[in-house]
Amino acid sequence: MNKGNLIENYAVALFNNAMVDNIQDKIFEEITSINRIITDNFDIREFLFSPIVNKNDKINAVNSLAKNIKISTIVQNFLLLLVKNSRIAILSNIVDAYNTLLYESKNIKIVQVISANKLQPKEQEWIKSRIEKELNQKTEILFDIDNTIIGGIVIKYDSMLQDYSIKGSLEKITKALKTVNIAV
């Protein structure tokens, strides 16, 4: 089984479990919080990800963490399953996949917008409204910065890529010039 399918399977299992009690949002908050704790704390991350540390010690650590931050039994059992199956290292990927499932269940499309500089709130709202109008669907926009695109924006969703960047335009021009045998 490839890693993508594995991640998706874990996310779907957790999501389906949360749906039983209609607590998908609560579970997302909890799993995101746990993931942030693990990601932000080097010692916890190294302890849980280490192949040398005994699984029982990891299980005790997860149980202690769950008790201290008061997470649901569903999330605690899910984390224990990941530890027992030596899959805790893919938790961040599972959280991302779960997030996608959560938005899909609400008919909200996740769209990534990349710009060369930080966009102003008015610009973000304008872009969001244009994308929602084009897709005829509510969106959750993730704004990222990549100064290598020079200017403009790149829009990604599903398997679509819309490149309105200066870098993308220059690459298209370069490719076109190469096809007509003009040295670049």
Curated annotation (Swiss-Prot):
Keywords recorded for this protein, A-Z: ATP synthesis, Cell inner membrane, Cell membrane, CF(1), Hydrogen ion transport, Ion transport, Membrane, Transport
Report membrane topology: Peripheral membrane protein
InterPro entries, alphabetized: ATP_synth_OSCP/delta_N_sf, ATPase_OSCP/dsu
Q: Name one GO cellular component term.
A: plasma membrane
Subcellular compartments: Cell inner membrane
Pfam family example for this protein? OSCP
Q: Which Gene3D superfamilies match?
A: N-terminal domain of the delta subunit of the F1F0-ATP synthase
> What does the record give under GO molecular function?
proton-transporting ATP synthase activity, rotational mechanism
Question: Principal place where this protein is found?
Answer: membrane
Family, according to the entry, reads as follows: Belongs to the ATPase delta chain family.
Q: How does it assemble?
A: F-type ATPases have 2 components, F(1) - the catalytic core - and F(0) - the membrane proton channel. F(1) has five subunits: alpha(3), beta(3), gamma(1), delta(1), epsilon(1). F(0) has three main subunits: a(1), b(2) and c(10-14). The alpha and beta chains form an alternating ring which encloses part of the gamma chain. F(1) is attached to F(0) by a central stalk formed by the gamma and epsilon chains, while a peripheral stalk is formed by the delta and b chains.
The record's listing under NCBIfam families reads: ATP_synt_delta
Q: Which HAMAP family match?
A: ATP_synth_delta_bact
Which PANTHER family does the record cross-reference, listed alphabetically?
Answer: ATP SYNTHASE DELTA CHAIN (PTHR11910)
Protein role = F(1)F(0) ATP synthase produces ATP from ADP in the presence of a proton or sodium gradient. F-type ATPases consist of two structural domains, F(1) containing the extramembraneous catalytic core and F(0) containing the membrane proton channel, linked together by a central stalk and a peripheral stalk. During catalysis, ATP synthesis in the catalytic domain of F(1) is coupled via a rotary mechanism of the central stalk subunits to proton translocation.
Return the protein name: ATP synthase subunit delta
Gene assigned in the entry: atpH
